[in-house]
Every structure is written in C-alpha cells, then in structure tokens.
C-alpha cells in the first residue's frame, strides 16, 4: 500500500521561532515522519518540494541584491530537511528517497510525498556525485535525496521515480547560459540513471527483477526557468529521443526556478515496468 499526501506551511503564519525557512522545513519533515509512522507507511518513495523564492537570500524578492547577507533559501531548506531526517533516524544519506526542489514565486512551503510500507531501492548516477555527498561549497548541509528510486508494486510491477535531473557532472553545473546544451546534458544524465536503475532492478526479488526501463518511454515533467526557452528544449528532446517518443509527446512543461541559479532546465520522470516473465 502507498500513501500520497501533502504538507503546506506558510512562512507568515507557521514560523518556527527565529530559524526561518530552516526551522519551517525541519518542522514540516518532522511532522511528516510522525504521520507516516502513524499510517504504517514509514518509507518515503518520492518527494516534491516547492519553495517560494528558492534562489533568494532573505525576505526580499531581490535575491541578487541580498547576496552575501545570509544563506540562500534553498540551503536553509536543506539544513532543516537533513536535520529532520537525522533526528527521526531516517536515511539522510545512502537510502534517501527520490526528490526534487523547485522554486515558486510566492506561497507556502509545499511538500507532496509518496510513501509505502517497504523501503525503495535507491539509484545513483555514475556521472554525478551523490547529492548527499556534495562538498560544503553548496551549503552547510547537503541536499537529502537519491538520484532515483525503485519501488516494488503488486503483480510484479516496479515503479521508477527519477529525481529532478539537470546539467550537472560530478557536482558542478556545466554549460551555464546555454539551455540547449543543458538540455542535452540533462538527457545524458537521464540515460545514465535509467541504465543504473536497470542494473539495480536485477537485484530485486523475482518477478520484479525482470523489470526494465527506457528513457524514451518515461513520463516526465520539464521545469523551465524562462518560458522563452521551451521551444529550444523541445527541439533538443525531439532530436535526441525522437519527436514521436512517449517522452516527447507526453511531457508536461512547467515554469519554475531551479535549485541552482545557473540551471535553466530540470527534468523529473517516472515509469512503471512489468517484472513478469
């Protein structure tokens, strides 16, 4: 059994002392873990995080002007999130769930989650440093998520949840300012994650171990920082995966800020494959 749920906390009315967004994210995840235990679905499979002004530095809308006056809001969020995982004895490093974190212009800290009775199998990308192993350059606490996760379903089916994926090699952003090349690199990373997921699936119990996935068959959400870049992104996807691929024809495109200010596009995806022989 799986549980789908939501948490929304307003920074205006639900502040956690003087800790700001860090305290709010800690509270949200602490409450989440308690709710999951009560529901009998303690294992997080996939999480979606939406933060107002994710690249900002304080309460001002002008993040650039505030640069250097404090910790970036995404890094504040990461601090509270990781501490909540640690306090609740949840896997904050190896075994962390698949997740994404996107920026919205205004609103509450919004978390959507999918949880189950059985822990998922985490999947990493060999082209990238695991997010939870990022160096301190990216903040005092690393992001808490795996690149993807495999979750067993009934009837031998297996679900693949791919975290938000972008133009990062190792731990560094590549192709800054070039949305076409960022899209190509993102697709290369998706291929690497799917290949790693197929290798990992072989370690599942039968009949789930026969499940296999294809990038072209993924259902995806494409987050774009600038709406004017949508056409260029779609052209690259059509060129690389084929304009008639399921990936291209069923993609959902949303405008959002990405967790790093130099990233222009991020793609998350999911799929279900049959493990039945």
Residue ranges with predicted function:
Residues 1-51, 55-218, 224-277:
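N-terminal presequence-like segments and the immediate start of the first folded domain
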